[in-house]
Protein backbone atom coordinates (compact mmCIF):
# COMPACT_ATOMS: atom_id res chain seq x y z
CA UNK A 1 0.00 0.00 0.00
CA UNK A 2 1.08 3.52 -0.41
CA UNK A 3 2.11 6.39 -2.57
CA UNK A 4 2.91 4.76 -5.90
CA UNK A 5 2.81 8.11 -7.74
CA UNK A 6 1.24 6.46 -10.78
CA UNK A 7 -2.18 7.18 -12.26
CA UNK A 8 -2.97 3.75 -13.65
CA UNK A 9 -5.61 4.92 -16.14
CA UNK A 10 -6.81 8.19 -17.63
CA UNK A 11 -9.81 8.02 -15.25
CA UNK A 12 -7.32 8.50 -12.42
CA UNK A 13 -6.53 12.10 -13.39
CA UNK A 14 -8.91 15.03 -13.55
CA UNK A 15 -7.90 15.92 -17.12
CA UNK A 16 -5.78 13.44 -19.11
CA UNK A 17 -4.85 16.15 -21.62
CA UNK A 18 -3.28 18.22 -18.83
CA UNK A 19 -0.85 15.40 -18.04
CA UNK A 20 0.48 14.52 -21.50
CA UNK A 21 4.28 14.08 -21.34
CA UNK A 22 4.14 14.38 -17.55
CA UNK A 23 5.17 12.15 -14.70
CA UNK A 24 2.60 9.86 -13.08
CA UNK A 25 1.08 8.82 -16.43
CA UNK A 26 3.94 7.62 -18.64
CA UNK A 27 3.58 4.25 -20.35
CA UNK A 28 6.59 2.92 -18.39
CA UNK A 29 5.09 3.94 -15.04
CA UNK A 30 1.71 2.50 -15.89
CA UNK A 31 3.26 -0.75 -17.14
CA UNK A 32 5.25 -1.16 -13.91
CA UNK A 33 2.04 -0.74 -11.91
CA UNK A 34 0.18 -3.14 -14.18
CA UNK A 35 2.83 -5.82 -13.53
CA UNK A 36 1.79 -5.91 -9.86
CA UNK A 37 -1.86 -6.32 -10.83
CA UNK A 38 -0.91 -9.03 -13.32
CA UNK A 39 0.79 -10.89 -10.44
CA UNK A 40 -2.68 -11.18 -8.92
CA UNK A 41 -2.78 -8.22 -6.56
CA UNK A 42 -6.11 -6.40 -6.49
CA UNK A 43 -6.73 -2.67 -6.29
CA UNK A 44 -9.07 -2.71 -3.27
CA UNK A 45 -10.51 0.74 -3.99
CA UNK A 46 -11.67 -0.26 -7.48
CA UNK A 47 -14.09 -3.02 -6.54
CA UNK A 48 -17.08 -3.96 -8.71
CA UNK A 49 -20.16 -1.99 -7.76
CA UNK A 50 -18.13 0.61 -5.88
CA UNK A 51 -18.57 3.33 -8.52
CA UNK A 52 -16.01 5.98 -9.28
CA UNK A 53 -12.80 5.78 -7.30
CA UNK A 54 -11.95 9.14 -5.71
CA UNK A 55 -8.72 11.03 -6.15
CA UNK A 56 -6.05 10.76 -3.45
CA UNK A 57 -3.78 13.68 -4.37
CA UNK A 58 -4.38 17.35 -5.09
CA UNK A 59 -1.74 20.00 -5.73
CA UNK A 60 -1.80 22.73 -3.09
CA UNK A 61 -1.78 25.45 -5.74
CA UNK A 62 -4.95 27.13 -7.02
CA UNK A 63 -7.35 25.32 -4.68
CA UNK A 64 -7.13 22.09 -6.63
CA UNK A 65 -8.71 20.02 -3.84
CA UNK A 66 -11.73 22.27 -3.50
CA UNK A 67 -12.27 21.98 -7.25
CA UNK A 68 -11.59 18.22 -7.11
CA UNK A 69 -8.88 18.57 -9.75
CA UNK A 70 -6.71 15.74 -8.54
CA UNK A 71 -5.19 12.39 -9.25
CA UNK A 72 -5.49 8.90 -7.85
CA UNK A 73 -1.87 7.91 -7.27
CA UNK A 74 -2.15 6.15 -3.90
CA UNK A 75 -3.25 2.53 -3.81
CA UNK A 76 -3.86 -0.36 -1.48
CA UNK A 77 -3.16 -3.64 -3.23
CA UNK A 78 -4.09 -6.97 -1.68
CA UNK A 79 -4.42 -10.63 -2.52
CA UNK A 80 -7.83 -12.22 -3.02
CA UNK A 81 -7.56 -13.84 0.42
CA UNK A 82 -8.03 -10.45 2.12
CA UNK A 83 -11.73 -9.73 2.60
CA UNK A 84 -12.23 -6.01 2.09
CA UNK A 85 -15.31 -4.68 3.86
CA UNK A 86 -14.88 -1.10 2.66
CA UNK A 87 -12.28 1.30 1.30
CA UNK A 88 -12.42 5.07 1.09
CA UNK A 89 -10.32 8.21 0.81
CA UNK A 90 -10.28 10.38 3.94
CA UNK A 91 -10.56 13.83 2.38
CA UNK A 92 -11.06 15.45 5.79
CA UNK A 93 -7.54 14.46 6.89
CA UNK A 94 -6.16 16.19 3.80
CA UNK A 95 -7.85 19.46 4.80
CA UNK A 96 -5.99 19.79 8.11
CA UNK A 97 -3.30 22.39 8.77
CA UNK A 98 0.07 21.07 7.68
CA UNK A 99 -1.52 18.03 6.03
CA UNK A 100 0.13 16.11 3.24
CA UNK A 101 -0.92 16.79 -0.33
CA UNK A 102 -2.11 13.16 -0.34
CA UNK A 103 -5.25 11.97 1.44
CA UNK A 104 -5.11 8.70 3.38
CA UNK A 105 -6.69 5.63 1.84
CA UNK A 106 -8.54 3.80 4.60
CA UNK A 107 -9.34 0.11 4.21
CA UNK A 108 -11.54 -1.95 6.52
CA UNK A 109 -10.75 -5.68 6.28
CA UNK A 110 -11.71 -8.87 8.04
CA UNK A 111 -9.13 -11.56 8.51
Model segments located where?
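Active-site metal-binding loops of divalent metal-dependent hydrolases
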Residues: 4
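Metal-dependent phosphoester-hydrolase catalytic domains
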Residues: 9-111
Amino acid sequence: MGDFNVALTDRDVWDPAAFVDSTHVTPAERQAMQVMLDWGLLDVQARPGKGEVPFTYWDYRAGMMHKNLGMRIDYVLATRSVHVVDAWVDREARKGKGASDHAPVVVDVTL
